[in-house]
Amino acid sequence: MEVVIIRVGELTVKRGLTRAEMERLLLRAAREAAEECGGARFEKEPGRIYAYGDVNCLKKALSKVFGVKSVSPARVITYQKITDIALEAADLWSGIVAGKRFAVRVHRVGEHAFTSREVAAEVGAVLVAAGGRVDLEDPELEFYIEIRGNRAYFYTEVIEGPGGLPLGSEGKVLALVSAGIDSPVAAWMLMRRGAHVDVLYCNLGGTITLRHALEVIKRLLAWSYGYNARVIIADCGPVARAMRRGVREELWNIAFKRALYRIGVEIAKRLGAIALATGESLGQVSSQTLQALAAVEAGIDMPILRPLIGMDKDEIVKHAQKIGTYELSAKLPEYCAVFSRRPRKWALREEVEAIDLALYDAITEVVNNAKIVRKRELDEFIKALTPPHDIEIDSAPEGAVIVDLRDEESYKKWHLPGAVRAGVDDVLALVDKLGRDKTYVFYCYSGGLSLDVAESLRKLGIKAYSLRRTRNAVPPSSQGERGN
């Protein structure tokens, strides 16, 4: 019979009611993961869980369940004597061992009339007879046999799981996720420590950017077996507009991060979360210096968890690649209207108070209008997002007005030939001045804002596009700070 062996990690050191509850949570998550494979039958023993079903599918799904140390697809038999084990091993492995160096690893649990070494010797003998050569130090093939009671499990594959604690064993956290590289990793790391993680995404772009971000979040939540996580989508446009009107540009980075914290706290309280989580890494960008972090969290009455605080970018990227979000995150367009070209790394208390006052109404509006989508509804929600299919183009049509949405200094250093400059708040005035019957093509540092502006103008009946190629055409020295 085919089975998947599930090994648990930290859970084994727990005792009593705590362990029983964690086992319940892990089994609940495992059952949800198994639904992707048509379901499974589970059996539990001390230190092991066995899943019977579509083994090839289950080994992949169950290796993404938090609390699982590793899994192995295996063949299980009921034996009566040691020769039964050797015969099964010969049947399974004789066909692949010829001419290969191999090792037999045996693990036993319980009382038996033989030792692990005796089993290894018996199995090794039949595999040598099949043309293999024993090499315990540097084998080409490793054959594993696990013996528990009168059952023997045969396997060759050990697939690493995420480890950690079962999801839901450590309370609820609201993660501020931009869908860039860092913040999904931070959310994943807290999920790994047993937290139920809901996600807050602050949308500053149009439908295309939102869809892309939700695909990243969906990839993250593919790990959240056992919890139908909430995705809170907040239209943060009001905050960006209020900030540009009422906050000095050098403080935009700090102001926007602080607004995110304020929005997060209010939504977290409504959801019953007891902490916020962010993807900040100390010193990575100007808004993540100690001085800046002290300014943005001053007066915030909720714990702020920063799992990445001591990691460098290379470490974070490796984690993102491991959990499967990196490729999508790296392609996410950035909104470039809320980052200062010369950001301040600190703020005085009175400046922070002024920021709170300037953004209070906008923050309230964002919180009250936020949408909540459950993980299981996310696919349908994404499918329902229908941006114009032709909004991104590679070159401007003849006679089109090309509009540079970057700051004035960057425009002076470099811009596309014939382009005019306009800030995001000036776009409508520019269109009214030049005529709504013209075609407008926008570009920005990396595309997020230009997509958003083009889509917004199309809703007003104006022919507008975002220029795709400028994402790589804008000189790196002109590009704004990338958020988390």
Swiss-Prot record:
Q: What class of enzyme is it?
A: transferase
Disulfide cross-links: 336-444
Q: Where in the cell is it found?
A: Cytoplasm
Identify the residues that bind ATP: 176-177, 257, 279, 288
Q: Which GO annotations describe the biological process of this protein?
A: thiamine biosynthetic process; thiamine diphosphate biosynthetic process; thiazole biosynthetic process; tRNA 4-thiouridine biosynthesis
* Catalyzed reactions: [ThiI sulfur-carrier protein]-S-sulfanyl-L-cysteine + a uridine in tRNA + 2 reduced [2Fe-2S]-[ferredoxin] + ATP + H(+) = [ThiI sulfur-carrier protein]-L-cysteine + a 4-thiouridine in tRNA + 2 oxidized [2Fe-2S]-[ferredoxin] + AMP + diphosphate; [ThiS sulfur-carrier protein]-C-terminal Gly-Gly-AMP + S-sulfanyl-L-cysteinyl-[cysteine desulfurase] + AH2 = [ThiS sulfur-carrier protein]-C-terminal-Gly-aminoethanethioate + L-cysteinyl-[cysteine desulfurase] + A + AMP + 2 H(+)
User: Molecular function terms in GO for this entry?
Assistant: ATP binding; CCA tRNA nucleotidyltransferase activity; tRNA binding; tRNA-uracil-4 sulfurtransferase activity
Tell me a GO cellular component: cytosol
Q: State which Enzyme Commission number(s) the record gives.
A: 2.8.1.4
Which family is this protein grouped under?
Belongs to the ThiI family.
User: What protein name applies here?
Assistant: tRNA sulfurtransferase
